Amino acid sequence: MAARFARGFVNRNPRNNELMGRQAPNTGYQFEKDRAARSYIYKVELVEGKSHREGRLVHYQDGVVISASTKEPSIASQLYSKTDTSAALNIGRVLALRCLQSGIHFAMPGATKEAIEKSQHQTHFFKALEEEGLTLKEPAHVEHSYETDKTFTWKRYPQKPTRQDKLDEL
């Protein structure tokens, strides 16, 4: 019965593939020290300028998808200062709200834990994102296999060592 409905399924939210675990994060950075910072689908970052703050949600292929800045008149009119800690906190709230409204629920933080702990602006920004409901961790990727997709034509088998491999160990 479920197969009848699955045949006519149209994904109207292409960004929902990350939520369902279908899209794998960017890979190929196994030998780099900061491979976790480069392997993401969405990344949230706070850009601090001299006279403003800007929060951005960056997709690994498309670049900036959603942003919120103290340059925007609607946000700037509600703030005492465009560069203080409360500005970073409110930019985090607005960005999280925009992300959730557009269907994006997971993102990786764009700064390291040390940088977040060192800066009050970063700390309040990421804390506001979490309080508003944006999860700062991406869901696990579902590996593409025959169990998850019956149209998959081959099955992975464990590789067994050859005679040459055994001779190399000696």
UniProtKB/Swiss-Prot annotation:
Similarity section: Belongs to the universal ribosomal protein uL18 family.
- The keyword Cell wall biogenesis/degradation is annotated on this UniProt entry: no
Subcellular location(s): the record lists: Mitochondrion
* The protein's name in its UniProt record: Large ribosomal subunit protein uL18m
Under the subunit heading, UniProt states: Component of the mitochondrial ribosome large subunit (39S) which comprises a 16S rRNA and about 50 distinct proteins.
User: Which Gene Ontology terms cover its molecular function?
Assistant: 5S rRNA binding; structural constituent of ribosome
What species is given as this protein's source? Answer: Caenorhabditis elegans
Q: Which GO terms describe its biological process?
A: translation
Supply the alphabetized keyword list: Mitochondrion, Ribonucleoprotein, Ribosomal protein
One GO cellular component assignment for this chain's record is: mitochondrion
